[in-house]
Amino acid sequence: MSRAIRNIAIIAHVDHGKTTLVDKLLQQAGTFAAHQHLAERVMDSNDLERERGITILAKNCAVTYEGTHINIVDTPGHADFGGEVERVLSMVDSVLLLVDAVEGPMPQTRFVTRKALALGLKPIVVVNKIDRPGARPDWVINHTFDLFDKLGATDEQLDFPVIFASALYGYAMLDLKDKSENMRPLFDAILRHVPVRGGDPNGPLQMQISSLDYSSFVGRIGIGRISRGRIKPGQDVMVLNGDKPPKRARVNQVLGFKGLERVQLEVAEAGDIVLINGVEEVGIGVTIADVNQPEAMPHLSVDEPTLTMNFQVNTSPFAGQEGKYVTSRQLRERLDRELMSNVALRVEETGDTDVFLVSGRGELHLTILLENMRREGYELAVGKPRVVIKEIDGVKCEPIEMLTVDVEQENQGAVMQALGERRAELQDMQSDSRGRVRLDYRIPARGLIGFQSDFMTMTRGTGLKSNVFDEYAPIKGDGTNARRNGVLISGEQGDAVAYALWKLQERGRMFVSPGERLYEGMIIGIHSRDNDLVVNPIKGKQLTNVRASGTDEAVVLTPPIQLTLESAIEFIDDDELVEITPKSIRIRKRFLLEHERKRASREPAAA
């Protein structure tokens, strides 16, 4: 009855080709029937993941190779989704560490690798994209070895097997001199090097939930690895959740993975990764145990949120015109639904029923949620992100991030100066022989808010940056990153007029185009000075009977700055909001009327 099982996770930095590699493994193991059309990057299942080329949620799939069932778990490479990573690693016996043949190991690989090594997992290193011009596999392997050594790897972990691969063209090899047409060397390495760590299938059941899914049809679904015993549909189990009293429950369905499909199983046993539903109390770290001999497993920790934002009902004059879901009840229901599967998220009530305090792992984590809500037809406003301050032993502490930037040498000075102003501390600096420099910093998380757009401007789009949470440390100085420029605020409601925008161009750069609908208090551009300025963008040219309309000057407009969700959230100040609807992203002042803003600015001064 017992089948040979291997459980493996894939670790990689964003865009190092992890999801493409899984595509090829699925294809070559014969998972897709000949008549099935295979989309590219099958593991990135939602639109946002495909557009951005990043994996947000850990996903599972399985292949069968030479009679062995291999469960493959895709992990998010981005540190904002690190909450997912740790739990995934608890289900597997080894990891495939995928590194780019040009870039080498990057900080997010470092983040997950540190966790994998600490758990005692022995990695298999896959040097991917060896078909790229400029590939330098030997340099990459040396850097990977140094990284493992820095992260405290054991001698056994440092003696790692290396596979060279091109996921795009679907081949792998043990030596660069070898010829290869397929992924067979990688499959063989998995069978040879991944330990079989199955428990006793005849013992009392023990299974820990490491990941959650939600289906409107069957409710919450728990995903986890069976450590001991067997589980089958209709079985009575005990749910053990930390200090809470044990609860009896009945499993409705047991599903396994076959390719990308979920298939119903008659029975599953120790060593397999399965999904179960029908158990209401299922949650991260919960142990599903035998009714007669319930034994809890050590509880899994989840990364704490480091960034918080206010999500609130849209109160602008255009509220409810573009969105389908606009009330606080609908917002609350959507956030509650997100909490079912998005474990690193926290939602708290505030004194105001229309405002929710949402905390997450970083800017990307929260903007992905906002972008998903926007696409589903939600309309809301959000405030400026703030870091989560903790009190440790009576000292106020803030989150510190490890930041790595890879820039061209001519941009190095500007980037270092900007990071110095944001209270970053340089840890390491390496230059390669190709005119690029890699800088490692420790930086307070609040120093990173708004840094992405500045960084892209300074490096003219050629810079690479990535950051990962390191620890909480005592707050140093105020170090607030105040915006240098003021803003241009519309003083009227109506449609923007080309003539007015043309006249306003000398005052700053615009966010709006002629014909766009505006309202009083909406921010329409960046002022060239450091103060805010109320302007009239809907004022047309005054015509008299002497000056005919035909003798007009040529109106030449500079193209406006295109606002994206991330750039708008990075841009705003404490007294501003981003209005998010399915069709538009607007920036506005919290108080729309000028006299209200003046009164609000006087209140703190009076206090």
List the predicted regions and their residue ranges.
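P-loop NTPase switch module centered on the Walker A-proximal segment
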Residues: M1-V99, E103, H143, L212-S215
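Conserved structured catalytic cores and adjacent interaction surfaces
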Residues: R3-T20, A79, P105-R114, G120-K122, ...
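Residue-level signature of catalytic and energy-coupling elements of molecular machines
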Residues: D15, L21, G53, I72-D74, ...
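Interdomain boundary/hinge elements
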Residues: L38-E40, L151-I163, R197-Q208, D243-F257, ...
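Conserved nucleotide-binding/hydrolysis modules and their immediate coupling elements
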Residues: Q206-M309, A319-Q321, N485, E492-T544, ...
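Long insertion/accessory domains within large nucleic-acid-processing enzymes
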Residues: F257, R262-L265, I443, S453-M458, ...
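A short, contiguous, amphipathic alpha-helix enriched in charged residues
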Residues: S316-M340, A554, T558
